[in-house]
Amino acid sequence: MKRFGKYRAVKSQCRAGHTHDSKREAIRCNELHDLQAAGAISDLIIHPQYWFVINGRQIKHSNGRRVGYKSDFEYVEKGINVTEDVKGVVVRDWPLRRAIFIALFPHHQLRETK
């Protein structure tokens, strides 16, 4: 019997062999690899991680864990750094995490793909 995640997403692999949290994310990874091969985008990174730091101090949870954001993809498109997240279900903490990311990383364009 297949085991589903919290939102019934099935872990899937893209053609490049990366494991993704959902089929939709794996399909988007294939599209981005095709765009990179065609020269439309460059410097594709899978699952980049960003840590939230304000005034040189790491933001931490009450238990001491660092607060950050792990997106699905990062790439350069027409000279612009794009951070992309494939969204199925919008989770409770996403609006806050999104706002913090935009404030701390203004040189990145954050895109949500449905």
Regions found by a protein language model. Name each.
Residues 1-114:
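Electrostatic, structured charged patches in enzyme active sites and in nucleic-acid/phosphate-binding
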